[in-house]
Regions:
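C-terminal secondary-structure termini that scaffold catalytic or DNA-interacting sites
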Residues: 63, 74-76, 81-92, 99-101, ...
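Basic, Lys/Arg- and aromatic-enriched nucleic-acid-binding interface segment
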Residues: 1-54, 62, 91-92, 159
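C-terminal catalytic core of tyrosine-transesterase DNA break-rejoin enzymes
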Residues: 39, 43, 49-50, 136, ...
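Active-site/catalytic core of tyrosine-dependent DNA strand-transfer enzymes
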Residues: 19-20, 98-151
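Catalytic-site neighborhood detector that most strongly recognizes the C-terminal catalytic loop/helix
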Residues: 7-8, 16, 72, 180-205
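Catalytic tyrosine of NAD(P)H-dependent dehydrogenase/reductases that use a Tyr as the general acid/base
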Residues: 155-156, 192
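Short, polar N-cap/turn motifs at the start of nucleic acid-interacting alpha helices
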Residues: 58-65, 171-191
Length: 218
């Protein structure tokens, strides 16, 4: 039996962007700060609080990594927010950054350093002296989905999209679990078993195609 806060609430369907859908979504984003936000969510599988909690000192440009070591909670407006530890101990993690994302982050930092008064490494990557509020991020996401002509997904579905990308690229369950910061591998399996089944089916179809091609050569 599921234990929901609202007894009338139904579990929300898990949706995710394919890589091509995400590229369409990203192509309509002209704001460098939000380009970085979407890529951090999609390629790093971050929770929304983790995204908002990233400061510039968490970005290691030399080693191409981002350190996830805190999250933002209790935020009702730009001036009211607080830090808290990540959801679990395993949620403290260091994740690799793609070359494109790293370059966008460099451009963003250069821009912020010029236009934000008192800029330093304690400033928020997705924000300024204060983190961006979730409602603004969600509104921007909704608009981009419409402009790009892709399905509407929740902010948390970017995390599922990341898991889907990792699985279809052949990442094992242990790697996916560590990447997402899950406490136990069982959590990853329970959440994404259907994706692994789909990936295995695709692999089987690929082998069948290879076998058919080999037979046609005889």
């Amino acid at each position: 039996m599921h234990n929901f806060n609202n007894p009338n609430e139904l579990p929300k369907e898990m949706l995710y962007f394919t890589y091509d859908e995400f590229q369409k979504f990203l192509s309509v984003e002209k704001d460098i700060k939000f380009r970085c936000a979407w890529q951090l969510l999609y390629y790093c599988g971050l929770r929304i609080g983790e995204l908002k909690g990233i400061t510039w000192k968490d970005i290691d440009f030399e080693n191409r990594t981002v350190s996830i070591n805190k999250q933002i909670t209790q935020q009702s407006c730009r001036s009211r927010w607080s830090f808290s530890p990540p959801k679990t101990a395993k949620s403290n993690r260091v994740l690799p950054l793609t070359k494109v994302l790293l370059n966008d982050l460099k451009l963003l930092k250069e821009s912020d350093s010029k236009i934000l008064f008192g800029f330093n490494d304690t400033y928020f990557v997705i924000g300024d002296i204060a983190p961006q509020i979730s409602s603004t991020i969600t509104a921007k996401k909704n608009r981009n989905c419409e402009l790009a002509g892709v399905k509407q997904i929740r902010i948390h579905d970017f995390r599922h999209s990341c898991a889907s990308l990792l699985i279809y690229k052949g990442a094992n369950i242990n790697t996916v679990s560590k990447f997402l910061g899950h406490t136990k591998i069982e959590e990853t399996l329970n959440t994404y078993t259907h994706l692994y089944k789909n990936a295995l089916t695709d692999i089987t179809a690929l082998i069948d195609d290879m076998n058919n091609e080999q037979k046609s050569n005889f």
